[in-house]
Amino acid sequence: MGVPRTPSRTVLFERERTGLTYRVPSLLPVPPGPTLLAFVEQRLSPDDSHAHRLVLRRGTLAGGSVRWGALHVLGTAALAEHRSMNPCPVHDAGTGTVFLFFIAVLGHTPEAVQIATGRNAARLCCVASRDAGLSWGSARDLTEEAIGGAVQDWATFAVGPGHGVQLPSGRLLVPAYTYRVDRRECFGKICRTSPHSFAFYSDDHGRTWRCGGLVPNLRSGECQLAAVDGGQAGSFLYCNARSPLGSRVQALSTDEGTSFLPAERVASLPETAWGCQGSIVGFPAPAPNRPRDDSWSVGPGSPLQPPLLGPGVHEPPEEAAVDPRGGQVPGGPFSRLQPRGDGPRQPGPRPGVSGDVGSWTLALPMPFAAPPQSPTWLLYSHPVGRRARLHMGIRLSQSPLDPRSWTEPWVIYEGPSGYSDLASIGPAPEGGLVFACLYESGARTSYDEISFCTFSLREVLENVPASPKPPNLGDKPRGCCWPS
């Protein structure tokens, strides 16, 4: 392998002399074309408490390049006396609707203050577009509908940031996290909180939304999701999350995000000091690399079939899964993945919205051996620096269920870097796929500008180191309150 190539980039948003700053990028391709929607926060200063509103630029693919339109302020994506933060869009292929989720935070209340006091100031909101981002409807406050009374036990919460996903069953998923209040003193003063990733979901094309169970064990925060076909190991919803533990955390769901199995640390994905948001995107492995094993099934008597609308997910059976204690659990393509035969099974907890509901999850055959290469691969973007947010890197996993499978990074930008979002935007001329990355960058700080670049799967394979090399995680775990 020669000297790694650095993709050319386009600066889409740049800090202004007045102090106006653009942060927290989110990228969504909308077919046909696709049209690219680049969302960011517009802030009065780089500080979280000075977030102001959400803005958008639309891009169209033309002749192998992207032509970008002017900046558009999303005036309806707001609640009175609140600041709009954390853009997280998801596209419903069935209706063509884009749902832009965000949180609306009262006044200038910082997240750290909410965590310290145990008093949530955030609302769950979304706006919708049916014309690929040209126009947007009014804001919906979904807090009561999606979270309900459980929000009383949350010090704060947020969505994404980044992008949501849709499964072939039709389920829409929006990644999220909360700081759950684990203990209070008798006079109402907060005693202890813990961060947990989870997902909001809709099974009716976005008409109604519900809250899935929390990742139950390790501290996990800002996260993204991908559907993963693990070959012999089955199909899962994969969650990759920021953590104060010195490395990223991953968790799997067998029921489309209704609940998550216990998480594990990913030593091959080190965090920067205090952590940083990162992005993942799943995609079908190149055809010669797709293993097949007919000894696995999706439901009784049904062989594992190639993906229909995306890798790793299949149409759900009609009947509900049965709890061995006599109840039923929500259906979905992930909830019935079982090996044929009577292999050993280990039951695991399925926390509800508050993490302590007496419910369950279908267990995986444990331990399982992830194949050397799986039918779904993952890309991951995150700053490479350990002490500071420096050098945007791209890593590849050809076996996502194995936390040791990540490559060393291909650095696509040298310099201060921060939050990012990845997307698969179409086929490459030489075969394979083209990906896009929207990321924070700058000459002096990571919030000087928001840059956009594209690269192909072939370029990833040519530029990432050939084999993963787990880093030394000598850093002590950090506290559970992080700067964004």
UniProtKB/Swiss-Prot annotation:
Catalytic site residues? D47 (proton acceptor), D48 (proton acceptor), Y419 (nucleophile), E440
Motif stretch (FRIP motif)? 22-25
Note the InterPro entries from the entry: Sialidase (IPR011040), Sialidase_fam (IPR026856), Sialidase_sf (IPR036278)
**An MF annotation (GO) of this entry:** exo-alpha-sialidase activity
**What is the role of the protein in this entry?**
Exo-alpha-sialidase that catalyzes the hydrolytic cleavage of the terminal sialic acid (N-acetylneuraminic acid, Neu5Ac) of a glycan moiety in the catabolism of glycolipids, glycoproteins and oligosacharides. Efficiently hydrolyzes gangliosides including alpha-(2->3)-sialylated GD1a and GM3 and alpha-(2->8)-sialylated GD3. Hydrolyzes poly-alpha-(2->8)-sialylated neural cell adhesion molecule NCAM1 likely at growth cones, suppressing neurite outgrowth in hippocampal neurons.
Q: What is this protein called?
A: Sialidase-4
Catalysed reaction, written as an equation: Hydrolysis of alpha-(2->3)-, alpha-(2->6)-, alpha-(2->8)- glycosidic linkages of terminal sialic acid residues in oligosaccharides, glycoproteins, glycolipids, colominic acid and synthetic substrates; a ganglioside GM3 + H2O = a beta-D-galactosyl-(1->4)-beta-D-glucosyl-(1<->1)-ceramide + N-acetylneuraminate; a ganglioside GM3 (d18:1(4E)) + H2O = a beta-D-Gal-(1->4)-beta-D-Glc-(1<->1)-Cer(d18:1(4E)) + N-acetylneuraminate; a ganglioside GM2 + H2O = a ganglioside GA2 + N-acetylneuraminate
Q: What is the effect of changing R5A?
A: Impairs mitochondrial targeting
Supply the source organism for this entry. Homo sapiens (Human)
Gene this protein is translated from: NEU4
Recorded effect of pH on activity: Optimum pH is 3.2.
Regarding protein family, the annotation reads: Belongs to the glycosyl hydrolase 33 family.
Task: List where Low complexity composition bias occurs.
Answer: 336-345
